[in-house]
């Protein structure tokens, strides 16, 4: 029996508003527990929620960027459940009239493009955060009432790799709109995954498992990969899949049962009586649409068409808005686009990945990188020397020209000076000359290495090659 994997994702994104969705409480991350809450957030008797218009604008902006149809009439509902981090015993969410529906995004895996549908995007408030210790449980209500959008995908993904690509693309689009920073480590992007298997050709879905507590895109992919194998083994051996909630455990690299779900959750939704229905007219929609900046796909296409970058470069540079904006600013300052791309995709990304940092955390600036790239273009420094300058720029900042002068790194491009060095090297390496003339091309590499060593890496490489061949041919 051949089985097909069905994957759908539910993503919660915290909106970057200055105040909460139904109160004036601040939303700053990392504050002392229970210092950013109010009687409205905690559901004291007699208090009334007031809808944050900016949260609605942000939700509309995200929905439009995800190609959703925007509702003209939308409303809020009470989702009823009891849990210690939910002080009101209900959550204000949206049930049957979400703010956005029928959207899609396009992903690419192994060179193949695929459209993934988005069922709905709705607004809701976040719950508090429980922390369980050996002495008991603690609840921090700072997060209670934070504005969220929940983005529910269609079950269109067939592999864990597609799920990873979907999350990357979704995060990128949301970050470009500016409505959220999407930092999983701070809880501003969270993901639950649903996965089931069915015989190829069967219309009906199999019984799904829900994966929770997935704190990185890599964990989402790994969790789905394991669950895919677990369910396949169970089904092929004649077993039955139960509807379960599971979590991915990195230590064992397995999904672990959290609870068995005997039926669908009944949250007894009913319309929120303290909030009127919301009417979104065309004028409001168009005002929000006009505020949407250039999105990653459009920016990627522009890099290829206008800057002549390879499609791969354009893809990597536009994965995050931070990197793309840095690239744009560097090129706008006069640097060559392809050379800038090479440095960002090479040395810069390697440094950031090794140090586990973001661009905003380092001393390198677009102006600094631009000036360094232009020094390479002019022949003032070689790419090899530039790496020494780069190390200083990214660690301490500064002016590339001043660094070059202070460290004596100016490239030697004087032909007379280099010819003298080349002649001395050849005089001391007659065997290498013979080897080269006898067809051993590696000999030229050895000679170039000796010249670079003699000049402390500061010789102009193209000029060295030219002079070297000229001098060899004279002998």
Swiss-Prot record:
One of its GO terms (molecular function) is asparaginyl-tRNA synthase (glutamine-hydrolyzing) activity. InterPro entries: Asn/Gln-tRNA_amidoTrfase_suB/E, Asn/Gln-tRNA_Trfase_suB/E_cat, Asn/Gln_amidotransferase, Asn/Gln_tRNA_amidoTrase-B-like, GatB, GatB_C_1, GatB_Yqey_C_2, Gln-tRNA_amidoTrfase_suB_CS. It catalyses: L-glutamyl-tRNA(Gln) + L-glutamine + ATP + H2O = L-glutaminyl-tRNA(Gln) + L-glutamate + ADP + phosphate + H(+); L-aspartyl-tRNA(Asn) + L-glutamine + ATP + H2O = L-asparaginyl-tRNA(Asn) + L-glutamate + ADP + phosphate + 2 H(+). Pfam families: GatB_N, GatB_Yqey. Keywords: ATP-binding, Ligase, Nucleotide-binding, Protein biosynthesis. It is an enzyme of class 6 (ligase). The keyword Ligase applies. One of its GO terms (biological process) is translation. Its EC number is 6.3.5.-. The keyword Mitochondrion does not apply. SMART domains: GatB_Yqey. Belongs to the GatB/GatE family. GatB subfamily. Allows the formation of correctly charged Asn-tRNA(Asn) or Gln-tRNA(Gln) through the transamidation of misacylated Asp-tRNA(Asn) or Glu-tRNA(Gln) in organisms which lack either or both of asparaginyl-tRNA or glutaminyl-tRNA synthetases. The reaction takes place in the presence of glutamine and ATP through an activated phospho-Asp-tRNA(Asn) or phospho-Glu-tRNA(Gln). NCBIfam families: gatB (TIGR00133), PRK05477.1-1 (NF004011), PRK05477.1-2 (NF004012), PRK05477.1-4 (NF004014). Heterotrimer of A, B and C subunits. This is Aspartyl/glutamyl-tRNA(Asn/Gln) amidotransferase subunit B.
